[in-house]
């Protein structure tokens, strides 16, 4: 309840979604949380990410991992969540990672493309959405502006969890 009191401008639906994350898993109710982020296969490539552990190629593996480990939530790109959201509906709070990038270029000034939407997060029953910003990037102003626009669009439904990538 104390944590929820810090979000006085949010509506009951948004607070309910935040509560789902805070009360789930082994740390549920402690005010602490652990989220399984599975977007590295997109950003760093499947060879580096999944080849060392072949079962990880199956998106459902990550749902099971998060559940067996008693984690607070599972965050992933749209395709990963679509692959298992129906089978695991209500079992685990989901976080849709709205933006992603790949490693096919040697871009020293990274920027992520928006690959998910608020509508998709609602359709999948997500408890929150995630977004990555690279603070040192020359594109940081555009990333912050997109983050602000998505935050405004998401506010009636979700907390937007921002990740500052390095």
Annotate each language-model stretch with its function.
Residues 28, 33, 41-166:
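Alpha/beta enzyme core
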Residues 1-38:
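N-terminal basic, low-complexity leaders that serve as flexible interaction/assembly modules and, when applicable
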């Amino acid at each position: 309840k104390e944590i929820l009191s810090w979000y006085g401008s949010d509506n009951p639906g948004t607070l309910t979604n935040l509560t789902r994350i805070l009360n789930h898993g082994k740390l549920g109710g402690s005010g602490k949380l652990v989220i399984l982020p599975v977007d590295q296969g997109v950003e760093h490539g499947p060879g580096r990410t999944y080849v060392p552990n072949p079962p990880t190629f199956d998106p459902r593996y990550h749902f099971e991992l998060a559940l067996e480990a008693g984690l607070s939530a599972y965050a992933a790109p749209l395709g990963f969540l679509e692959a298992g959201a129906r089978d695991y509906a209500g079992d685990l709070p989901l976080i849709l990672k709205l933006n992603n990038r790949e490693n096919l270029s040697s871009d020293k000034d990274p920027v992520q493309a928006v690959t998910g939407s608020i509508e998709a997060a609602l359709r999948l029953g997500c408890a929150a959405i995630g977004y990555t910003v690279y603070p040192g990037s020359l594109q940081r102003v555009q990333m912050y502006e997109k983050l602000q626009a998505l935050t405004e669009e998401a506010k009636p439904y979700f907390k937007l969890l921002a990740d500052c990538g390095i």
